[in-house]
Amino acid sequence: MPKHGKKYLDAAKKVDSNKLYSVAEAMKLVKETSYANFDATVDVAYNLSVDPKQADQQIRGSLVLPNGTGKTQTVVVFAEGPQADQAKAAGADFVGSDDLVQKIQDGWLDFDVVVATPMMMAKVGRLGRILGPKGLMPNPKTGTVTMDIEKAVKNVKAGQVEYRVDRQAAIHTPIGKVSFTEDQLVENFDALRDVILRARPASAKGQYIKSVAVSATFGPGIKLDPLNLD
């Protein structure tokens, strides 16, 4: 068992580990149990009854949270010509081609999201070993490989988050900050819940959502009722 500090233990006392909370109760509690000395991120963890090894059960996508993420995302765009102009106009922080490839190969990673046109993916592919392990590789399923660069950049800046089932059949996604109101957190939670429900593979068996928990950075987990997420 990992040892926790006094602040964590004090926060954990507010959570009944045997209770399954409603969404509204959980969002109230996640704010109350945050003890970080910064505006902590609120994360949701879903455990699903899917087999990620099966190609048709690999759940992945993105959505724009109605109230954003509370974080300013630094966006890199690989594009040329009109698409590069679109990216700059839409507010991309860095736009380029071979110059950006070289910069990243030299160790620069001061960004949060990478967007690329399909034509640029051959060049971006050379960065697979660098971007892949950090979850930064552009992908059509998350809307980050596209010809509509303007839309992609604006979505990221508006609060787009990605969701992806991992090897343990879990999805971990941020839904905001503890400074958000309870209603804002509930609305963001609902938006993520809806896309995860819609993404249920036809071949998935049994109870699709096995468990759900929310937590603030460093804070204790708060379990929700997976059968009552309204």
Swiss-Prot record:
It comes from Lactobacillus helveticus (strain DPC 4571). Binds directly to 23S rRNA. The L1 stalk is quite mobile in the ribosome, and is involved in E site tRNA release. GO terms for molecular function: rRNA binding; structural constituent of ribosome; tRNA binding. This is Large ribosomal subunit protein uL1. The keyword Membrane does not apply. GO terms for cellular component: large ribosomal subunit. Pfam families: Ribosomal_L1 (PF00687). Belongs to the universal ribosomal protein uL1 family. Gene3D superfamilies: 3.30.190.20, 3.40.50.790. Part of the 50S ribosomal subunit. Keywords: Repressor, Ribonucleoprotein, Ribosomal protein, RNA-binding, rRNA-binding, Translation regulation, tRNA-binding. The lineage of its organism: Bacteria, Bacillati, Bacillota, Bacilli, Lactobacillales. InterPro entries: Ribosom_uL1_bac-type (IPR005878), Ribosomal_uL1 (IPR002143), Ribosomal_uL1-like (IPR023674), Ribosomal_uL1/biogenesis (IPR028364), Ribosomal_uL1_3-a/b-sand (IPR016095), Ribosomal_uL1_CS (IPR023673). GO terms for biological process: regulation of translation; translation.
